[in-house]
Amino acid sequence: MGLFKFEDLPVNTLVGTSLGTFNKVTYGGKEVDKKYKSKYRLSKFVSAILTPMYKINDRMAENLPPIEGVKDPVFIIGHWRSGTTFIHNVLSQDPQFGYCSTYQTVFPHLMLCGRPFFRWCMKTVMPDSRPTDSLELNPDQPQEEEFAFTNMTPYSYYHFWMFPRHIAEYRRKYLLMQDLTEDELSEIKRCQKSMIDTALHVSGKKQFLSKNPPHTGHVKALLELYPNAKFIYMMRNPFTVYKST
């Protein structure tokens, strides 16, 4: 049983990012409300402490040999609450697929080193279920990689969880892919490929299974990376989706 509920966690998931990325995400006109100051400071402190390990891990990832016989990735897309988590959990039972785990989304820079210890830490403190629908949570379950991107790059839609006042900007740039610079787009693509390659190495699989609702707006960029990628688009009664969301 996890020690904390979501609302009681002393840190947020930015503990899994490097200090440099942490600063890029939190600076630039971002304001932290008074009641979240302690969580902000502790998250930044943990990020600073772990950043040297993150750099070691990233060097290891850069030196991984290419995987032979890799198959085209499969991307599960669709609006939130349309059944993407369900189909992801079902298809991930197929042994041919590798995927991004909950641990890997929080600590994408610790996928190759330090994993046993930090996985234990995460399992000890994390809540047992999602607050939105009470689905079980554990470090090894399949998870959407957008949460990993929040810790790999300052260019993620899910940063609105930390700074909801800026959701319009995040939505325009990192969900709809509008007004992106070439450097931002290149960095987003690099993170996507790095996540898939490293996850496949860790799992020993040949085909990546992705579930990421924000990818619904990223299909063009994904096809530029993976021209033969497969997509599963989840559809559900829009009234039910709206009510659930």
Task: Identify the function of each model-found stretch.
Residues M195-I196, K211-N212, V219:
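Ligand-binding pocket scaffold of soluble enzyme catalytic domains
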Residues K55-I76, F107-H109, G114-F117:
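N-terminal signal-anchor transmembrane helix
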Residues I77-H79, L209-P213, M235:
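Short His-Asn-centered micro-motif
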Residues K211, L222-T245:
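Conserved phosphate-donor/acceptor-positioning beta-strand/loop module used by diverse small-molecule
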Residues V106-F208:
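PAPS-dependent sulfation machinery
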Residues G2-P52:
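Charged, amphipathic alpha-helical linker segments immediately N-terminal to NTP-binding catalytic cores
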Residues Q93-Y103:
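Post-Walker A helix-loop "phosphate-sensing" segment adjacent to the P-loop in P-loop NTPases
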Residues I76-Q93:
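Glycine-rich phosphate-binding P-loop
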